């Protein structure tokens, strides 16, 4: 009788052990996903790392988006000083939401705000700026999106901080007051501080 009971218990335990072994790979996968998620900034898409950080800006030369301007934007324009480069489009809803932040940034004369107009219709882009204001010192029209690809743009809007031709910071998604205060502005201040320190040492 005792032997039969032992056999029954053993038979019941075997499928349970099998289920545990089957679930182990899934559990390991979920752990890896969680680690990857937190390494990317606790799920904050604005903190996804860029392969171009601390590297020179990709070479580019874009025509002007605005009909009255003959000069667009090229990599040489970013070679000296601190620049905030915003990639935007008139068809981008979040770009409209972040636009007041860019207008505020444009008031700070310690750096220059420039724009890359991404895969847009020039007339629509001009209407967009006509309605909301133009924070950009220069704008280049990236009509085919190739420059955006070279910059590693995931989608619009995206904002880069460039110091002396080197990308030092990247913010993905629409800027907000919180994003400006906690992320972008500290990166700008750091770049400005590094520029000042370099100038003083020479």
Locate predicted features.
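Compositionally biased, proline/threonine/alanine/serine-rich low-complexity intrinsically disordered stretches
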Residues: 192-202
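A short beta-strand-turn-helix
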Residues: 60-84
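Thiol/disulfide oxidoreductase modules built on the thioredoxin-like
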Residues: 130-135, 141-193
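Hydrophobic alpha-helical transmembrane segments of integral membrane proteins
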Residues: 18-23, 29, 96-97, 153, ...
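N-terminal targeting signals for export/organelle localization
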Residues: 1-63, 202
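Hydrophobic beta-strand anchors of alpha/beta hydrolase catalytic cores
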Residues: 84-85, 113, 159
